[in-house]
Amino acid sequence: MDVGSKEVLMESPPDYSAAPRGRFGIPCCPVHLKRLLIVVVVVVLVVVVIVGALLMGLHMSQKHTEMVLEMSIGAPEAQQHLARSGHLVTTATFSFGSTGLVVYDYQRLLIAYKPAPGTWCYIMKTAPESIPSLEALTRKVQNFQAKPAVPTSKLDQVEGRDAGSAPSRGDLAFLGMAVSTLCGEVPLYYI
């Protein structure tokens, strides 16, 4: 055996892979484009993971809410209890900015509006299918205020207490607790 043949055996085997060892290579792309492509892929993967986690959390929250509602209302005795105490959740009170207070009484189908100075109170009867929004109520009150005022005694005689009339103090029982609390001490006007 000669010395030259030993050297041939000590050499490393040839590399048949497409990319050099230890380097990820994309053929025919400059280095800065390769780095940009890697950054874009990493950012997209991070966004996909975050959106997936948020959607899973939203799904779990929705399922939990549905389960709690089903447990609280689903039982027959719970439905009977809600039917018996239905009058407890029939009013909604909204602060109308600094201009006043609005009370919706869904059981009696009454809406009461008291302006902030508190000198009068407007009461409106509604139908169950056409309960006005706060904006519609504001327009109606503003239209009522823009009309010329007719003395209430004339209204009581002619129209039998129609729009714009003021009731006597004995009529407050039909208004309910929330509306009579809001409007108990000031003159009432029916719109």
Curated annotation (Swiss-Prot):
Keyword vocabulary terms for this entry: Disulfide bond, Gaseous exchange, Lipoprotein, Palmitate, Secreted, Surface film
Give a GO cellular-component term.
extracellular space
Q: List the disulfide bonds.
A: C121-C183
Q: For this entry, list what GO says about its biological process.
A: respiratory gaseous exchange by respiratory system
Q: Name the source's superkingdom.
A: Eukaryota
- Segments crossing the lipid bilayer: none
Q: Which Gene3D superfamilies match?
A: 3.30.390.150
- Keyword field contains Lipoprotein: yes
Where does the BRICHOS domain lie?
A: 94-191
Subcellular location, principal: secreted
Q: Where in the cell is it found?
A: Secreted, Extracellular space, Surface film
Which residues are removed as the propeptide when the protein matures?
A: 1-23, 59-191
Entry-linked PANTHER family: PULMONARY SURFACTANT-ASSOCIATED PROTEIN C (PTHR10800:SF4)
Q: Add the further remark from the entry.
A: Pulmonary surfactant consists of 90% lipid and 10% protein. There are 4 surfactant-associated proteins: 2 collagenous, carbohydrate-binding glycoproteins (SP-A and SP-D) and 2 small hydrophobic proteins (SP-B and SP-C).
- Main function: Pulmonary surfactant associated proteins promote alveolar stability by lowering the surface tension at the air-liquid interface in the peripheral air spaces.
- Protein name, please? Surfactant protein C
